[in-house]
Amino acid sequence: MSYVIDRRLNGKNKSTVNRQRFLRRYREHIKKAVEEAVSRRSIMDMEHGEQISIPGRDIDEPVLHHGRGGKQTIVHPGNKEFTAGEHIARPQGGGGGGGRGKAGNSGEGMDDFVFQITQEEFLEFMFEDLELPNLVKRHLTGTDTFKTVRAGIANEGNPSRINIVRTLRSAHARRIALTGSSRALLREAQKELERLKVEEPDNFTDIRETEIEIERLKARINRLPFLDTFDLKYNLLIKQPNPSSKAVMFCLMDVSGSMTQATKDIAKRFFILLYLFLKRNYDRIEVVFIRHHTSAREVDEEEFFYSRETGGTIVSSALKMMQEIMADRYPASDWNIYAAQASDGDNWNDDSPICRDILANQIMPHVQYYTYVEITPREHQALWYEYERIGEAYPDTFAQQQLVSAGDIYPVFRELFQRRLAT
């Protein structure tokens, strides 16, 4: 049996390199199309590809040609509309445009080039240039991790990693190679013995000698060991360094009665986008979900996004719970701590100063980055202004933005998590 081992990096995708080069070349067109797709899509529908349309004029290749030298005077008969230097508009209908024009008998043009990008490519462009700000490498034990990966087959290794199939295949090949000539002689001797028994049954001397030769050849073949140390093959596993920083993201969502269903939907969409971003870009990050009204509760992902529980509004309950969880499970000396909070800004008046106090004294000194989005078309209330004071005290690690409609989610998200240049 023949085995074909395909060691190409791209496998069957022979055009992968060309496709990547094409995506780099038209990156601006694709980014613009992705941003438009994000603005019109549901956040739940973000993990699909997208059709990209590039104007035909933008895919023209540059051409080297002779310039128009000298002075030329040309008379174009019948021209009453244009003067020198004006651009002639593309003819309608018969010009090869992409619109719903009527048929025409003149004009020519070029249709837009349309192609499909995959889910992976869509998400790559969607989250390009985004990151968790101030992610630092902690120097604690266990921060540097390694992942074990397959690295082929080795002739030496741990007995527990022996590759039985490769070992038996190697042993079989060795036996065939070393006993090939003996097996050929054995077949000839067996044929000779059959001929002697049929044609010369009385020639006992030759028959006996042939039988002795057959026994000798069989003994030679059987002396070859079934398995030799040379045949042993082992799965080779190597450790690849997987440098990573331990990070945790706290997601705090207001589900009080003042939050309308539309407002809650925008908040959920913002957190779904954040969750998708975190899971795609960071291997080692934990997410803590906290819902709050008059009281706060840590919940799982399913309950965070789909529970219908509601109540009054005391924002400080969520901040207190976050501080307790930080102290209990995520000490700042071990973890990079992030938080994202979404609310409509409605809060019990006496509670807003408490929120500022908890943030300023118990949370902000320990977090890498804290974001607050207020979902309201109305004027800001006390909570927003208290948080502005936090932003003044922590300009590098605190950010707040306002959301009015679902169309603001992606631009605000990019503003909050835009990659900062190192200073």
UniProtKB/Swiss-Prot annotation:
It comes from the Bacteria. It comes from Pseudomonas entomophila (strain L48). Residues 92-107 have a biased composition (Gly residues). InterPro entries: UPF0229, vWFA_dom_sf. This is UPF0229 protein PSEEN0423. Residues 85-107 are annotated as: Disordered. It holds the Pfam family DUF444. Disulfide bonds: none annotated. NCBIfam families: PRK05325.1-2, PRK05325.1-3. Belongs to the UPF0229 family.
